[in-house]
UniProtKB/Swiss-Prot annotation:
It comes from Picosynechococcus sp. (strain ATCC 27264 / PCC 7002 / PR-6). This is ATP synthase subunit a 2. Keywords: ATP synthesis, CF(0), Hydrogen ion transport, Ion transport, Membrane, Plasmid, Thylakoid, Transmembrane, Transmembrane helix, Transport. InterPro entries: Alt_ATP_synth_F0_Asu (IPR017692), ATP_syn_F0_a_bact/chloroplast (IPR045082), ATP_synth_F0_asu (IPR000568), ATP_synth_F0_asu_AS (IPR023011), F0_ATP_A_sf (IPR035908). NCBIfam families: altF1_A, ATP_synt_6_or_A, PRK05815.2-3. CDD domains: ATP-synt_Fo_a_6. It is a multi-pass membrane protein.
Length: 233
């Protein structure tokens, strides 16, 4: 059993390397895109909905409600990005029940790419909510001396997101490999079930942390506005 999918090489020619991380990442994305296209064509608006549509509506509504609870804002601006992050990580982790499949989230390159996507999304959402000047001013608060620390904080949060997901998935794979070597008959079934639960939790935690980072700028702005209104009153 491989601890990380980076070690599984499917093709290599000079500096071109196609490993399991790349293959299974694209496979996961392809499944999500094809599934989304199929679902979009099959959606119905009738009193009696098919079971799969009921299930998907429950999932989307759950994501919607969690965004509203965490951000205390309208969920629509965050739903597509955060929902995509959650569904990608969830699908990548749940596919581990397929023999031979290795979750791409067990590779630091994949988790770093996801963290960089969040890193880029933070200023995009911040500028959209507060304007470019308002967002840039947040790096100078409460004093301009904090500017280098604010910048370091942005990079450290990105690094923490990447390393946290990678470390948790890799440690889970390592634990499964150790237990499989000790008790090869009964452990695989139990570890598969535990891995499914673990994968759901990791997808949820990563999405929530990303949501908190993205929404923090607008939340701070709203708090400052409410404080100033109270002082004026």
């Amino acid at each position: 059993m491989q601890i990380t999918p980076d070690n599984i090489i499917f093709y290599q020619y000079q500096f071109v390397v196609i490993n399991a991380t790349l293959v299974y990442t694209w496979l996961t994305m392809a499944l999500l895109v094809i599934g989304a296209a199929w679902v979009t064509k099959k959606l119905v608006v009738r009193p009696k909905l098919p079971p799969w549509q009921n299930f998907l509506e429950i999932v989307v509504d759950g994501i919607y409600q969690h965004i509203a609870e965490v951000t205390q804002q309208e969920p629509e601006p965050y739903l597509a990005f955060v929902g995509t992050l959650f569904l990608f990580i969830l699908t990548a982790n749940l596919l581990t029940v397929v023999p031979g499949y290795q979750a791409p989230t067990g590779s630091l390159s994949t988790t770093t790419a996801l963290a960089i996507a969040v890193f880029i999304a933070v200023p995009i959402y911040g500028i959209r909510q507060r304007g470019i000047l308002g967002y840039l001013k947040s790096y100078l608060q409460p004093t301009p001396i904090m500017l280098p620390f604010q910048i370091i904080g942005e990079f450290s949060r990105t690094l923490a997101l990447a390393v946290r997901l990678f470390g948790n998935i890799m440690s889970g794979n390592l634990l499964a490999a150790i237990l499989l070597a000790l008790v090869p008959l009964f452990v695989p079934v139990a570890m598969n079930l535990l891995g499914l639960v673990f994968g759901v939790i990791q997808a949820y935690v990563f999405a929530i942390l990303a949501l908190v980072y993205i929404a923090s700028a607008a939340t701070v702005q709203e708090k400052k506005q409410s404080i100033s209104m109270e002082e004026n009153s």
